[in-house]
């Protein structure tokens, strides 16, 4: 995006919030300038809540000025729910990792917080943005970041195993830093 302050050359580093579609214009519009994503992602999730199908993206609210409504007041933890101006965690992380001109990112947010209830209006009272919930428990996507930025072994399986008999769910052995993972359920390989 064009910005008089950026264009003046007065800054040693540039950055902007969200809008991953703008990232690729940085090397052309600001050649040689270090760039950091100053506020990124805005993925929405409720720890322990899984909406099927897991690969169906949800943008909510569809517009920032119209609160989203779902009677559960929950957002799926499959990293498939985001606000219109943001992206899913995995999507932005891939952009950062695959483009050398991006120095890094600040994720919005580390923790859920009271106030700015998004995507729901009243009676919701908090955000759903954090990779850690209000009680301090990591959400599933926390382990995605951990698997990318630590030397210790990481393998995170989800969702929980508290389903009703016959209820469909997608099991992910997705957040890991192993060369390969094979999942067995009751002695049978799932791949």
Task: Give the residues covered by each predicted segment.
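Extended substrate-binding grooves/exosites of carbohydrate-active enzymes
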Residues: 1-191
